[in-house]
A protein has these predicted regions:
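N-terminal G-site helix/loop of the GST-like fold
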Residues: 1-19, 177, 181
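Short glycine-rich, Thr/Ser-proximal phosphate-binding strand/loop in the N-terminal lobe
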Residues: 11-30, 108-114
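Anionic-ligand binding patches
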Residues: 31-186
Length: 186
C-alpha cells in the first residue's frame, strides 16, 4: 500500500504517515458486505482523526472486502482459510468493495467503489504455489491483484485501484469535498 500511496501522492510532493486504527473488524450479524466495509473505513478515519483535533490534518481511511454471493471475505485466518476462500472463488466472479473515508476537521466525505473480479480456474498446483509464496494471509479474499495473485485473475471490471484497496478517482473527489484539490497522476 505504501508504494501505491507514494505513486498517488507524487513521491513526496504531499507527505503522509500511515497510522494503525485499532478497531474491531468482526462483521456484525446480518451486516452486508457494503455496510461492513463502510463501517470499517469510517471507524478507522474517526479513530485516527481524534488524535489530531488541534491540527489541520487530512485523514484518509480505506477498507476493502471481497463479496462472494453476499458473504464477507476479509483476510484469511490461516492457510486453510485462504485455501477455502480461493477454492470457492475459483472460476467464478466476485465483487470487491473498497470504502474510503476522508476527515479534515469538521468536514467528512465517504464513498464506496466496487469492481467485479473473475478468477481463473485454480488448479491444485497453482493453489499450492500461490499459498506457498506467503502473499495470501494479509489480503482480503486471500489474493493480491497487484502481486503474484494477479496470476489467479482472469478479468477485472472496474478500477484496478479499487481491487488493490485505494480507488484513486473517488479519493480525489472526496479530497475536493474536504477542501483539497488533488488529481492523482497529474
Amino acid at each position: 500500500m505504501t508504494k501505491l500511496l507514494d505513486e498517488a501522492f507524487g513521491e513526496g510532493e504531499m507527505p503522509f504517515d500511515i497510522e494503525p486504527a485499532d478497531i474491531d473488524e468482526t462483521p456484525l450479524e446480518f451486516e452486508t458486505p457494503l455496510a461492513h466495509v463502510q463501517r470499517l473505513a469510517q471507524g478507522k478515519a474517526h479513530v485516527v482523526a481524534q488524535r489530531y483535533t488541534d491540527l489541520d490534518v487530512i485523514v484518509i481511511a480505506a477498507d476493502t472486502t471481497v463479496d462472494v454471493d453476499g458473504e464477507i471475505y476479509g483476510k484469511p485466518e490461516n492457510l486453510d482459510d485462504a485455501r477455502r476462500m480461493l477454492g470457492e472463488m475459483s472460476g467464478r466472479t466476485h465483487r470487491v468493495h473498497t470504502a474510503i473515508s476522508v476527515v479534515r476537521g469538521d468536514r467528512q466525505a465517504h464513498t464506496v467503489d466496487s469492481a467485479s473480479v473473475t478468477m481463473v480456474q485454480i488448479s491444485p498446483e497453482l493453489m499450492d504455489w500461490y499459498l506457498g509464496i506467503g502473499e495470501s494471509l494479509d489480503k482480503a479474499g486471500a489474493y493480491a491483484l497487484q502481486g503474484d495473485g494477479g496470476k489467479l485473475v482472469e478479468t477485472v471490471q472496474g478500477s484496478f485501484t479499487t481491487v488493490v484497496g485505494l480507488p484513486l478517482e473517488p479519493l480525489s473527489d472526496l479530497l475536493a469535498q474536504c477542501g483539497l484539490s488533488w488529481k492523482f497522476g497529474a
